[in-house]
């Protein structure tokens, strides 16, 4: 079909990417390298190796990489420094994983001499954009193969027929007690799409949720947790310092137990359509609330407001696939600069789906001055008479406008 010699496929070992693997071999007559990323999705990844071997992939062309620490340290934490939320709700669990997968695919392509990369994203979704913008940003001349935009296997029936014809194992997981939904998981979240969720008027079934108990079934006793931050990043939980991915895993455990982090939303995809999805982001929900709390005591007011103004733009960059763009990197530099003083601890209370901040402090960088903020006698620390001139000057433009309106009648 083309002069592609070797292609690196983002390979999960599931039905779709297994069909893609065989299709690449048959259609492009090229050597295939498989790459499977461990992002903390909680699945056994060794079967992906065994499946690749059955397709004739050379052992040296099978890559299964543990990227959990890099994912949280270099992608999730930088995003949370900006308090990033897309369209007021979505914590970008899928979006933030794609730049890392693309990065590693390109690294493998360079190491193995591959001239092409391939992914399993459909032509309807955001992931095709996220993957491919990453590929081109990191390796401008790379050939990109997107099977869902090329082949004629455009229905589930055709995909299954192709798999059966070529001896590809068909795992009907939902018949074995698994999920019938299209799912994506990593350490930050798990998402659910498809089936009856395509009807936005239908409530999600309780049996769908994997990581969280329902708030109604959560413990009747609240749990207090202390979180410590350094330069905007979480470094310890209840005094225990852990690696970045271990911290997020611990927050997921705590949040899941208390029914925290469920989300059912209709989002605006970059390609133009609206899509309904359900998400569980227990650890991320806790982290966002706690990070905003420590910022509230350590950030200057105008800096905090500037961050809030810029955050929706930053969120759109990540959602739409522009992680590797110069504008995202420039904005990240600004965000990271603001985090130099975001040091301290936050105490939260977890209770039946709620994350409640109950205390926060910073020994080194707190801007909260109790001698000024007190409602008691401040011993002259704040001269209330100064407020008169402050108010009159701020009212000047409105007084001028009112006078002009009076003259006009």
UniProtKB/Swiss-Prot annotation:
Annotated GO biological process: argininosuccinate metabolic process; L-arginine biosynthetic process; urea cycle
Keyword Phosphoprotein attached: no
One term of GO molecular function: argininosuccinate synthase activity
Segments passing through the bilayer: none
Domain of life: Bacteria
Enzyme class: ligase
Binding site for ATP: 10-18, 37, 120
Binding site for L-citrulline: 90, 95, 126, 130, 182, 191, 267, 279
Alphabetic keyword roster: Amino-acid biosynthesis, Arginine biosynthesis, ATP-binding, Cytoplasm, Ligase, Nucleotide-binding
Catalysed reactions, as listed in the record: L-citrulline + L-aspartate + ATP = 2-(N(omega)-L-arginino)succinate + AMP + diphosphate + H(+)
Binding-site residues, L-aspartate: 122, 126-127
Any one GO CC term of the record: cytoplasm
Pathway membership: Amino-acid biosynthesis; L-arginine biosynthesis; L-arginine from L-ornithine and carbamoyl phosphate: step 2/3
Entry similarity comment: Belongs to the argininosuccinate synthase family. Type 1 subfamily.
Name recorded for this polypeptide: Argininosuccinate synthase
Organism listed in the record: Azoarcus sp. (strain BH72)
């Amino acid at each position: 079909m083309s002069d592609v010699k070797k292609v690196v496929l983002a390979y999960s070992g599931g039905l779709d990417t297994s069909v893609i693997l065989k299709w690449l071999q048959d259609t492009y007559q090229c050597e295939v390298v498989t790459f499977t990323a461990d992002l903390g999705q909680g699945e056994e990844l060794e079967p992906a190796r065994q499946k690749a071997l059955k397709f004739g992939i050379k052992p040296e062309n099978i890559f299964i990489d543990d990227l959990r620490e890099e994912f949280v340290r270099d992608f999730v934490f930088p995003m949370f420094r900006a308090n990033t939320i897309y369209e007021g709700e979505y914590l970008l669990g899928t979006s933030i994983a794609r730049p890392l997968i693309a990065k590693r695919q390109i690294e493998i392509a360079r190491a193995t001499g591959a001239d092409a990369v391939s992914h399993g994203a459909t032509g309807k979704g955001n992931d095709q954009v996220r993957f491919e913008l990453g590929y081109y940003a990191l390796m401008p001349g790379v050939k990109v193969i997107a099977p869902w935009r090329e082949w004629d296997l455009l229905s589930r029936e055709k995909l299954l027929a192709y798999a059966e014809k070529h001896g590809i194992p068909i795992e009907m997981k939902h018949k074995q007690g698994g999920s019938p939904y299209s799912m994506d998981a990593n350490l930050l979240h798990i998402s659910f799409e498809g089936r009856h969720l395509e009807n936005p008027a239908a409530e999600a079934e309780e049996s769908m949720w994997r990581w969280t108990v329902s708030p109604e079934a959560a413990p009747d006793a609240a749990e207090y947790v202390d979180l410590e931050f350094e330069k905007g990043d979480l470094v310890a939980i209840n005094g225990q310092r852990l690696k970045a991915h271990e911290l997020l895993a611990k927050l997921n455990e705590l949040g899941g137990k208390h029914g925290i982090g469920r989300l059912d939303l209709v989002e605006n995809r970059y390609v133009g359509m609206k899509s309904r999805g359900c998400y569980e982001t227990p650890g991320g929900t806790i982290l966002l609330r706690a990070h905003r709390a420590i910022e509230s005591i350590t950030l200057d007011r105008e800096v905090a407001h500037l961050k809030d103004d810029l955050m929706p733009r930053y969120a759109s960059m990540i959602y739409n696939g522009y992680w590797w763009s110069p504008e995202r990197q420039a904005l990240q530099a600004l965000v990271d600069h603001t985090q130099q003083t975001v040091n301290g601890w936050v105490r939260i209370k977890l209770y039946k789906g709620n994350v409640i901040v109950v205390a926060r402090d910073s020994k080194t960088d707190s801007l909260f001055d109790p001698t000024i903020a007190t409602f008691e006698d401040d011993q002259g620390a704040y001269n209330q008479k100064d407020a008169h001139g402050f108010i009159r000057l701020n009212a000047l433009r409105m007084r001028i406008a009112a006078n002009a309106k009076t003259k006009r009648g």
